[in-house]
Amino acid sequence: MTTTETTSAEEAPDSLAERVNNRSRRPSSDAFREFMGSQWGPRPDPGITRSAVADYLPARATAAGEPFSGERLVIPAGTYKVRSNDCTYRFRAYSAFAHLSGLGQEREPDSVIVLEPLPEGGHEAVLYFKPRTSRSSQEFYSDSRYGEFWVGARPSLEEVSAETGLRCEHIDTLRDALAKDAGVVRLRVVRNVDEAVEAMVNEVRMQAGLPFGGDAAETDDALEERLSEIRLCKDEFEISELQRAVEITKTGFEDILRSLPRAVGHRRGERVIEGAFGAVAREEGNGLGYDTIAASGNHANTLHWIDNDGPVNDGDLVLVDAGVEVDSLYTADITRTLPVNGTFSPTQAKVYQAVLDACEAALERANQPGTRFRDVHDAAMKVIAARLEEWGLLPVSAEESLSPNGQQHRRWMPHGTSHHLGLDVHDCAQARREMYQDALLEPGMCFTIEPGLYFRADDMAIPEEFRGIGVRIEDDVLVNPDGSVTRISEDIPRTIADVEAWIASAQGRA
């Protein structure tokens, strides 16, 4: 991997910050700078067109700013996160920034959306970012963060404005824009996203005599809460992107099925599975929406097993929880539990069917008028408790276990059944309880249904036949305009017969 540094060939870096990149040297003579800045051909036409999401951005800005009339709202994209030394992770924007800017993939680090209050009421979304510079500038070839010689073609302000429909300004003008009429105009900022932007806002607030730092925490938290809540109900663009994410995720699962014979016998067979899905995610989407769980055998009973360093054995079940994030940053979230050899054993099938019955009960409850989000979980738990009672595993009746003072069934199903889904795999996490768990289901809501049963190998409270079996089934569902709730992942097989046939077909055995 290449490196850069800012000193001449004759100088050794003095500061620790400079020494991060002290493995190579770059000339800094006037002759070199003049030569590097000349004789470049015209840039090719990038062919910028208005994006499909652009038409939805004004309504999103209006919704975000509605409770904060006359206030200036600052939403950073975030910055690169260091993996090691001078190596960073791929940039992924803060989700509220992506929602308001419409920018996806790895765009645009260190940028900021400002919702600027309008005299007539409402807000205008203004995007501040660092555009490309002339190829006669040193930045072009010397700046490994923004220079086109290092990171590839960068857009101009005009190009991004044409793409998004937003007014775009140079990031260097941000501070003056924030300070304009500060004091008369109140400022809010999303905290813990970009330290530099947060510090800038606090400096402006302090100089204007406004509460800042910890004294402004409640003010700022209300903005973050609002940005989360306006994403609870998806617009048409978001729904189409989620559907596309699910479709690509299905392709990834099909590659997993084809990888199973190779995974068996490999000392890290789980990583064979992880790699098969990851390749599809990167080739067809932006990447993974979250770390893939590829949990074979007893590993399925570790809820967030992402080490994926174990073998995949014939006769085991493998639980795969995975989702593709598309370029717009919307992600799917699907779990399927698969028999490695293509056929469920009787005990595996019994556990699997119980979980599937819980899925069906949850979906049925979601389709009843007046259903609240929390009711979906309760419906699934009734089935789980009933099956555990039938099998003689509960120390009390199912009715007693389901009571607030019982909950013994949760030993084998300790997580929630549902969460909202969108730009984040656990979307809208900062929403108030009354807007999330206690809310009535509304058109546009997209969420998961994912009950499970987890019988750990060392669980002495259950018969041996159950030990080491872990099953979760997860689908992504949508509340339609008429109030009905349907699985947008309905094309991904999940019944016992369909899963077995799916594996056989993928492996050419059908």
Language-model segments: which ranges?
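Active-site neighborhoods and metal-handling regions in enzymes and metal-associated proteins
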Residues: 1-510
